[in-house]
Swiss-Prot record:
Name of the protein: Arginine biosynthesis bifunctional protein ArgJ, mitochondrial
GO molecular function list: glutamate N-acetyltransferase activity; L-glutamate N-acetyltransferase activity
Pathway(s) this gene product operates in, as recorded in its UniProt entry: Amino-acid biosynthesis; L-arginine biosynthesis; L-ornithine and N-acetyl-L-glutamate from L-glutamate and N(2)-acetyl-L-ornithine (cyclic): step 1/1; Amino-acid biosynthesis; L-arginine biosynthesis; N(2)-acetyl-L-ornithine from L-glutamate: step 1/4
Role of this protein: Catalyzes two activities which are involved in the cyclic version of arginine biosynthesis: the synthesis of acetylglutamate from glutamate and acetyl-CoA, and of ornithine by transacetylation between acetylornithine and glutamate.
Family indicated by similarity: Belongs to the ArgJ family.
Active-site annotation: 233
UniProt transit peptide range: 1-22
Site-annotated residues for Cleavage: 232-233
Record's keyword terms, sorted: Acyltransferase, Amino-acid biosynthesis, Arginine biosynthesis, Autocatalytic cleavage, Mitochondrion, Multifunctional enzyme, Transferase, Transit peptide
Native source organism of the sequence: Verticillium alfalfae (strain VaMs.102 / ATCC MYA-4576 / FGSC 10136)
The keyword Transferase is annotated on this UniProt entry: yes
Length: 464
């Protein structure tokens, strides 16, 4: 696996006192986060990337804020979008584009940071269209099916794009395109907002039908707050040179997103702009993946799901005000849906998240969140929630340093907690909360972080 990293659990030794701002530069990356930024990569054939400064956000004079990713040949493509009812203009535009083109013939993705172009009416849709048109002109113009460029935006809601700045600089973004690591890193940096580091990964893989072919996959994502995807703001682009038919792209992406970007939460908010896109140009050759029943499809689905999960975890590690990376694992559930709801509820609980920050082994908050997770409406009879049985429920802290788990609740009965041991576990940067429901054999995993004082500071100052 190229450009990989192994983040070993460690105790926090750094207090985060830096100020977050739009788009991150190498000089501003906190020392504790630099280990997550790759220094090299293995990037898919036929793709080029760039990131340049155009000054989308007033006052930004130094940080790139326009990202351009292109393919030298048409791509099969799919995307998963936010389910927020107030969907941003680029979401509407890009969804319609993919539907119109039948998930084929995509040549590029153009992304701006600094302004979300959300809740901007017809003018916002016109701006999204102008962005795509400017990109299309650099890629040879529109074809009979119209635009071939997906557009994304991220930043403050309710403001119009400085569209002249963007459109007037797409040519410069095209001129800056390159296929090297620095080009991909510049592209990943340009989509950042309150992120403290660019989130970029790449890896190689093979497929059963073409064992001698080395395929490549690269992806970038952004997000640090407003993260509770139901595809938060969360943007992601994954590109591969594997040959994949347009008809199977939506299903393989949805499966991956459900187990990655839709399994993380920072603050429980779902953005107006969430978009995760997958592009495949087939430049590496080999047999096209055209059937969901093929061994190649299954193999690629595993690769994409694992890759997407690793990308999504980077978002959690950069959560606004976060000092801990927390895995919530719910097992022995009557259904996967119930397990996901319980894991999600625990992951979103402010009381759980603040207790983790305070290194307080207050398992009652975990149990409380578990208990109401499946109640769909006030007054619902608790006996109707058969997926949770109090006397079968177990809760533990699982350290990530290889030591034994600390049992907090066993079959509904509280354990005498070794507070010193609990404190040791909660000092770790990485930890796991394990909930065993004892009602079946299904499971689900969520990834989240804690809440610190800095979260309030960041979001209180967001527009200043």
């Amino acid at each position: 696996m190229a450009a990989s990293f192994k983040a070993l659990p460690q105790q926090l030794t750094l207090t985060r006192s830096f100020a977050r701002c739009y788009s991150v530069s190498a000089e501003s990356i906190p020392a504790a986060k630099k280990k997550y930024v790759p220094t090299e990569g293995s990037y898919p054939q036929g793709f080029q990337a760039s990131g340049i400064l155009v000054g989308v956000k007033p006052g930004n004079k130094t940080k790139p804020d326009l990202a351009f990713l292109t393919s030298d040949r048409p791509c099969a493509a799919a995307a998963v979008f936010t389910k927020n009812k107030f969907q941003a203009a680029p979401v509407t535009f890009s969804r319609d584009l993919l539907k119109r083109r039948g998930n084929r013939g995509i040549r590029g993705v153009l992304i701006n940071s600094g302004c979300a172009n959300a809740v901007t009416g017809k003018g916002g849709l016109e701006d999204a269209s102008l962005m795509a048109k400017a990109a299309d002109e650099q890629l040879g113009g529109e074809d009979g099916a119209g635009s071939s460029t997906i557009v994304m935006s991220t930043g403050v809601i309710g403001q119009r794009l400085p569209i002249d700045k963007i459109v007037g600089n797409v040519g410069a973004a095209h001129g800056a395109l390159g296929s090297g690591h620095k080009d991909w890193l510049a592209c990943a940096t340009a989509i950042c907002t309150t992120d403290t580091f660019p989130k970029l990964m790449s890896r190689t893989f093979s497929l059963p039908s073409s064992p001698g072919v080395e395929y490549r996959m690269a992806g970038m994502t952004k997000g640090a707050g407003m993260i509770h995807p139901n595809m938060a703001t969360l943007l992601g682009v994954v590109a591969t040179d594997a040959p994949i038919a347009p008809g199977v792209m939506p299903s393989v992406l949805k499966h991956a997103v459900d187990r990655s970007f839709n399994s993380i939460t920072i603050d429980g908010d779902t953005s107006t702009n969430d978009t995760v896109a997958l592009l495949a140009n087939g430049a590496a050759g080999g047999q096209e993946i055209s059937s969901v029943d093929s061994p190649d499809y299954a193999a690629f689905q595993t690769v994409l799901s694992d890759f997407s999960a690793d990308l999504a975890k980077l978002i959690v590690r950069d959560g606004e005000g976060a000092t801990k990376f927390v895995t919530i694992r719910v097992v022995d559930s009557a259904s996967e849906e119930a397990a996901r709801k319980v894991a999600s509820t625990i992951a979103r609980s402010p009381l759980v998240k603040t207790a983790l920050y305070g290194r307080d082994a207050n398992w009652g908050r975990i149990l409380c969140a578990t208990g109401y997770a499946l109640i769909s409406e006030p007054g619902q009879d608790i006996n109707e929630v058969a997926s949770i049985v109090s006397e079968k429920t177990n809760v533990s802290f699982v350290p990530t340093d290889g030591s034994a788990e600390l049992k907090l609740l066993v079959n509904g009965e509280p354990e005498t907690v070794d507070e010193a041991r609990a404190s040791e576990i909660l000092e770790l940067e990485d930890l796991e909360i394990l909930v065993k429901l004892g009602t079946g054999d299904k499971q689900a995993t969520y990834w989240t972080c804690d809440y610190s004082h800095e979260y309030i500071t960041i979001n209180g100052d967001y527009r200043t």
